C-alpha cells in the first residue's frame, strides 16, 4: 500500500514537471528589443556578431553585436550597420557574411521555383532587333 502511494506520488510529480515545462518554456537568448541607432565608435569595438532571424524561436529580426561581455541588439535595417558589415566583408577576404547566422532564403515564386534577378547589359532584346 505504501509503495503504491509512493509510485503514485512520483508519477504526479513527473506529470506536474512536464506541464510546467510546457507552460513556461526555457529562457532563450533572443533579443526582445532592437536599437535603431548605432555609433561608429561602438562598431570599432565589436569582437563578433551574429544574426537573429524572426523565425522559429525568436520573433524579432536583429543583428547581435558582441562587445566585451555585452550583447547589443541592432535593427538589421540600420544604414550604418549595413555599411559596416559591407566594409567588414571586404576586410575578411570577401566572406559571404561577416556575422554568423542563417543565410537569407532564396527568392521563390508562387510555384516554389527559385527566381533570379536578370541583369541586362547594353540594349534590351527588343531594341536590338530594330
UniProtKB/Swiss-Prot annotation:
SUPFAM superfamilies named among the record's database cross-references: Interleukin 8-like chemokines
Database matches in InterPro entries: Chemokine_IL8-like_dom, Interleukin_8-like_sf
Signal peptide: 1-16
Glycosylation sites: 78
Primary subcellular site in the record, as a coarse category: secreted
Gene3D superfamilies registered for this protein in UniProt: 2.40.50.40
GO BP: any one term: immune response
Parts forming coiled coils: none
Biased composition (Basic residues): 104-124
This protein's UniProt keywords: Chemotaxis, Cytokine, Disulfide bond, Glycoprotein, Secreted, Signal
Keyword rRNA-binding belongs to the record: no
Disulfide bridge partners, by residue number: 30-58, 31-73
Tissue specificity remark: Mainly expressed in testis, epithelial cells of normal colon, kidney, Peyer patches, lymph nodes. Also found in lower levels in brain, spleen and lung.
GO CC terms, sorted: extracellular space
Domain of life: Eukaryota
Residue ranges, annotated region (Disordered): 92-130
Compartment(s) of residence: Secreted
A GO term for molecular function: chemokine activity
Function noted in UniProt: Chemotactic for resting CD4, CD8 T-cells and eosinophils. Binds to CCR10 and induces calcium mobilization in a dose-dependent manner.
Family stated for the protein in its record: Belongs to the intercrine beta (chemokine CC) family.
Protein name, entry field: C-C motif chemokine 28
Organism listed in the record: Mus musculus (Mouse)
Encoding gene (name): Ccl28
Amino acid at each position: 500500500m505504501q509503495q503504491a502511494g509512493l509510485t503514485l506520488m512520483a508519477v504526479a510529480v513527473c506529470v506536474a514537471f512536464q506541464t510546467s515545462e510546457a507552460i513556461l518554456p526555457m529562457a532563450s537568448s533572443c533579443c526582445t528589443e532592437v536599437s535603431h541607432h548605432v555609433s561608429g565608435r561602438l562598431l570599432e569595438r565589436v569582437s563578433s556578431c551574429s544574426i537573429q532571424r524572426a523565425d522559429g524561436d525568436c520573433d524579432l529580426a536583429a543583428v547581435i553585436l558582441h562587445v566585451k561581455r555585452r550583447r547589443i541588439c541592432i535593427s538589421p535595417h540600420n544604414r550604418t550597420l549595413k555599411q559596416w558589415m559591407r566594409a567588414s566583408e571586404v576586410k575578411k577576404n570577401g566572406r559571404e557574411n561577416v556575422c554568423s547566422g542563417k543565410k537569407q532564403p532564396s527568392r521563390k515564386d508562387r510555384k516554389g521555383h527559385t527566381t533570379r534577378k536578370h541583369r541586362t547589359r547594353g540594349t534590351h532584346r527588343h531594341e536590338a532587333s530594330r
